[in-house]
């Protein structure tokens, strides 16, 4: 993968929908896929931009199919293209900022929404979260209303 062609996004569009309909045999070398996912989970600490892709791929560590290997390979190609990118923390005011979003009915299996948030202290990203909501929201507004209550628990922890 050293000389591979890089891609501009860590995950292909509609990958979650495609991977949810996996058919066919499980990958022969299960350990190799699991070790790759472990390494990518460690990498999330310094590359928060791949967090969603790693989360999606790691949900299939027990029974990965060929499409999951393609997704992992795509993620490695993205990382190859961003090898010189870095997070930059500058000195500034130490104000805490939080950003919240909700993805309505994003899970195609149970139609539960996902709440996401991130917090910065000054210009430094100090915490981020992406969690599936426990109840099924009937509208976008309801999903957006549930998200802040989940995030308040995270703020108390900070």
Residue ranges: model-predicted function:
Residues 1-158:
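Long, low-complexity, charge-biased intrinsically disordered regions
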């Amino acid at each position: 993968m050293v000389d591979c062609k890089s891609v501009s996004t860590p995950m292909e569009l509609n990958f979650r929908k495609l991977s949810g309909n996996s058919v066919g045999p499980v990958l022969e070398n299960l350990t190799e896929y699991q070790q790759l996912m472990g390494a990518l989970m460690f990498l999330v600490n310094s590359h928060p931009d791949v967090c969603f892709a790693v989360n999606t791929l790691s949900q299939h560590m027990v029974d990965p199919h060929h499409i999951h290997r393609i997704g992992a390979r795509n993620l490695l190609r993205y990382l190859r293209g961003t090898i010189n990118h870095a997070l930059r923390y500058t000195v500034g005011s130490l104000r805490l900022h939080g950003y919240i979003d909700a993805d309505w009915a994003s899970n195609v299996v149970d139609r539960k929404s996902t709440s996401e948030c991130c917090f910065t202290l000054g210009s430094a990203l100090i915490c981020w979260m992406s969690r599936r909501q426990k109840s099924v929201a009937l509208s976008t507004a309801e999903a957006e209303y549930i998200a802040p209550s989940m995030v308040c628990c995270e703020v108390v922890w900070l």
